[in-house]
Amino acid sequence: MITEIRFETTESGVLRPNQERVHDVRITRDGQIVHVILSTKEAAGRGMRHIRDEYQIGPGTAAAFLDSLTADFGIDEWPMDFGSPVLEGRTYEITIRHDDGTVRRSRGTVDLPPGGEALRNAVIGLAAFKRKPWIF
């Protein structure tokens, strides 16, 4: 049984001031959703700015979503790599944790996994996100 999924999406390319670079979204079976955004600082600033928003949804809703990953999206059959060579653009890594301690990862760049658009919409529909998360 899936206990948690994490979507980490990273923007590559030239660094610019005030630019979002990473979105990290975690959804747990107990209904916790954490959305972390890393972005560059102002033009004179060094380092990254870290924004963390947390949301709580019903455990039943969270469990139904996590169960749908296998039943509706076939996530357990995804290959480990959907990548295509790119120099700029987004890359993503999905980490899936199971109750038996196993961890499964898939990553990609340009090519979305099967049902990727529908999965993105399902995640975005789980909570009233303050900032729209990058999912893929």
Please state what every model-predicted region is.
Residues 1-23, 47-61, 68-136:
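Short, well-ordered, aromatic-rich surface patches in folded extracellular/luminal domains
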Residues 19-40:
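Short, flexible N-terminal segments of the mature chain
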